[in-house]
């Protein structure tokens, strides 16, 4: 999303991907329905989490958003890397994306090779990643929001500044408000 020439730079394309993924079916198939669906990287049960409802599975809405963004026939999104060993879940996500025209090529890797390539920020394309640290909203965002985060591939300067500001804030209510603001962006 950080490359202005990439289709992912357009928020409508990113939203289309959200609407294209059938999370309930994935949850049933992969976890026997035991996982709680979430909308963002911060689970609703975490301290300072903004209780956002997950986007519904709506391929028609995904197609509409892609058309509005200028991709009525979809686009080639490049390589798709499922986090080892979640290959079957990655394949299901890639299939959901392909159904609305977001075409990828699945590349699987051994976990050690994946981790090395990912942490050195050498993987390009789409990554289906699994990340489950404990803590609160801030600790969950630590790997995604600041540029040095292991899952970050770019950073919005305003969001990153707000993230750093909340880390220094000692007033709990102000900190919570800042973390909620980040989750809404």
Task: Please identify what each model-predicted range represents.
Residues 88-100:
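Short, polar/charged alpha-helical segment
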């Amino acid at each position: 999303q950080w490359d202005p020439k990439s289709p992912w730079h357009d928020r409508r394309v990113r939203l289309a991907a959200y609407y294209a993924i059938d999370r309930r079916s994935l949850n049933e198939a992969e976890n026997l329905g035991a996982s709680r669906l979430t909308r963002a990287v911060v689970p609703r049960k975490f301290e300072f989490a903004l209780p956002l409802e997950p986007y519904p599975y709506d391929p028609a809405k995904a197609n509409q958003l892609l058309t509005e963004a200028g991709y009525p026939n979809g686009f080639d999104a490049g390589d798709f890397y499922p986090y080892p060993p979640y290959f079957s879940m990655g394949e299901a996500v890639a299939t959901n994306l392909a159904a609305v025209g977001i075409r990828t090529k699945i590349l699987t890797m051994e976990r050690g090779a994946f981790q090395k390539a990912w942490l050195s920020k050498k993987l390009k394309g789409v990554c289906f990643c699994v990340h489950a640290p404990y803590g609160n909203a801030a600790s969950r965002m630590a790997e995604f929001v600041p540029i040095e985060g292991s899952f970050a591939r770019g950073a919005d300067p305003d969001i990153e500044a707000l993230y750093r500001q909340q880390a220094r804030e000692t007033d709990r209510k102000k900190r919570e408000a800042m973390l909620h603001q980040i989750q809404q962006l």
